[in-house]
From Swiss-Prot:
This is MFS-type transporter cctQ. One of its GO terms (molecular function) is sucrose:proton symporter activity. Pathway: Mycotoxin biosynthesis. It is found in: Membrane. The chain crosses the membrane at residues 54-74, 116-136, 180-200, 208-228. Disruption phenotype: Impairs the production of cyclochlorotine. Glycans are attached at residue 179. One of its GO terms (cellular component) is plasma membrane. Keywords: Glycoprotein, Membrane, Transmembrane, Transmembrane helix, Transport, Virulence. MFS-type transporter; part of the gene cluster that mediates the biosynthesis of the mycotoxin cyclochlorotine, a hepatotoxic and carcinogenic cyclic chlorinated pentapeptide. Most likely responsible for cyclochlorotine secretion and thereby may contribute to intrinsic resistance. The keyword Transport applies.
Amino acid sequence: MGQKETFYRNWNGGGDFLRTVFGLGGLDHTNDSPAEQRYVNSLETSSMMAENDIGSLMPLVYTTVAFFVAVVLPHGSPMSNSHSSKKAFALLNWPRVLTSRNIWSISHGIFAASMFGSFWVQSAVGTIPLFGIVGFSWAVTCRIPYYLLHDELYRSSTQRNRQGDDLTDSQGLIHGIHNFSICLAQIVVLLMINTVWILASDDDGDSFLVWFLLLGGACALLAMYFTTRLREPENIKYEEIAMEEGDYGFSE
């Protein structure tokens, strides 16, 4: 299974999260009487100020989690830099079962759990852990897919070099397809969101936001399934290739 399908479904889930999670609205009280409306406005003003102060911690928690996950993730891909990758796994005591593919699958599961949790969480405090853990998924998505892509290109280039072929043009095409799949998913999600918002402008928008988040969770589960179908990179050692062709597996 190629990575581009998983990229597309992953960003279908991630796009609507990035578009809506920082813009959740309040309840609509336009049908209340004037006296009730003034009372509700007074309560909402004080409550909104308190919730905004608490809710502002959510982006901080999200970015902090993403930062620390990016730090502790093993640096380098297992194929192109097997020695450094093994050293990183040993240093951080990473279990061998946590391969690049499995870590990416787990990140999809965490994202889906967060999106589905938005159906029940209704407080500003609840959004802090709910969306803060998505920082893990974001950090993994910004790194692991490119490791897998690099490993696939490295494997192909090694085979082509052994056959005397040039893979330079093909590598550019593969990168272009992956970038296109990422951009296309975000465009599709934003068009869906804007279309529904226009059609439902007179209705309660909060319910539509929740359903969009649930849709993101469903897309994340689909991406998780496709991720499990990806082939694990083979552990090709530099030393073995260098003995055959020299210069770390690339002919001059």
